[in-house]
């Protein structure tokens, strides 16, 4: 059963970029398509490494010999939204890491599972109207053996992360339920689950149609 963290925000205060460790606030001057000079405010990470990508999220499929395919989601308190969130495991990419290396490391740390990266997305924008932060989505597979115990997490100091294994066929419904209970669902996880659910509900929209003359 999912339970909300007892953590809570005690105050918000303004923070100059010069005093911030992880994020900076900048003003952008630019010229729009009509030649008009404009400005924009942007929040940027200070930690981007050589790969040019800030973070990685680990979409994961868990295969078990006698159970349906599932995925592991993590619940943790996120101060910016003042709530417990439901997310796929994710983390920042270290300075000299590749996204795939970070994905394997972070999945192991947050869930205890050893996974294999199957595919990696291009660097995609996290919230392009507010920040230049970007990320890669690494889809991963974890293959379990019958009777294999749940592994121990390897969390960093200060991390309080609850992992939950959810059957893929139930993911969208479970996310909807958690949202009604007051959990905040991470957009990337919700979008993936909603897309999968849409395909399940409307398979006729995704049937390939042979084009006239194809293969001729």
PLM feature spans:
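Nudix hydrolase/Nudix homology domain
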Residues: 2-6, 81-84, 95, 128-131, ...
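Active-site-adjacent beta-strand/loop module that shapes the phosphate/pyrophosphate-binding cleft
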Residues: 31-34, 128-149
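Conserved Nudix-box catalytic region and its N-terminal flanking loop in Nudix hydrolases
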Residues: 10-13, 52-59, 66-105, 122, ...
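Acidic, metal-coordinating catalytic segment for phosphate/diphosphate chemistry
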Residues: 17-59
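Short, solvent-exposed loop/turn elements at beta->coil junctions and helix N-caps
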Residues: 13-16, 45-46, 122-127
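Short, well-ordered beta-strand micro-motif
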Residues: 27-29, 60, 139-141, 165
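A short coil-to-beta-strand element that immediately follows conserved catalytic motifs
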Residues: 114-121
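Short amphipathic beta-strand and strand-loop transition segments with alternating hydrophobic
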Residues: 6-18
């Amino acid at each position: 059963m999912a339970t909300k963290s007892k953590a809570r925000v005690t105050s918000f205060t303004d923070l100059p970029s010069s005093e911030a460790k992880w994020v900076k606030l900048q003003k952008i001057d630019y010229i729009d398509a009509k030649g008009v000079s404009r400005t924009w405010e942007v929040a940027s990470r200070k930690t981007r490494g050589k790969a040019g990508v800030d973070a990685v999220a680990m979409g994961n499929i868990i295969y078990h010999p006698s159970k349906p395919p599932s995925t592991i989601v993590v619940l943790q308190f996120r101060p910016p939204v003042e709530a417990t969130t439901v997310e796929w495991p994710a983390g920042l990419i270290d300075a000299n890491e590749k996204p795939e290396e970070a994905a394997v490391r972070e999945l192991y740390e947050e869930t205890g599972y050893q996974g294999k990266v199957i595919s990696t997305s291009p660097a995609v924008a996290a919230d392009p109207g507010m920040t230049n932060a970007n990320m890669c989505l690494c889809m991963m597979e974890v293959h379990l053996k019958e009777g294999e115990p749940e592994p121990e997490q390897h969390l960093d100091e200060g991390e309080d992360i609850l992992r939950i294994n959810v059957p893929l066929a139930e993911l969208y419904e479970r996310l909807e339920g958690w949202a009604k209970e007051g959990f905040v669902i991470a957009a990337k996880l919700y979008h993936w689950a909603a897309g999968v659910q849409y395909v399940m509900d409307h398979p006729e929209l995704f049937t390939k149609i042979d084009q006239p003359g194809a293969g001729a």
